[in-house]
Amino acid sequence: GDHVLFMDLFSELINAIVSRDLMGALECGETIAALESREKQKAFCTFASECIRKIYMIQQNLPQIAQVSQEEQEFYSRMAACCGKSFCHRTVTNIEKVVAMIDRNVSSKILFCDLVNRMFLSL
């Protein structure tokens, strides 16, 4: 159910970031922050971490471990080429911090705005 929605949000976000479109990326962050529940926001974070790990695996020339479907192959390969080596590690760490903060009732809007900025800067 949420897979398609989450993939759309993630690809829109990462495409905006690699295109250096900060406004577009921040708009994506607002859309994610507006997901109807904290559980759904956390589920998106888990999904996004998995996507970032797939990008990392492809960067490491381990596509078989990444388990990327045929239709998503081109997208992940393109992102792997666009993202620096440290981007994946930093981003997964930042996403984990967001999940912890969601549990502490911190404003989602602030959290996802901050996450987008950090992703943008760490590219």
Named regions from a protein language model:
Residues 1-47, 51-123:
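Charged, glycine-rich active-site and insertion segments that engage polyanionic ligands
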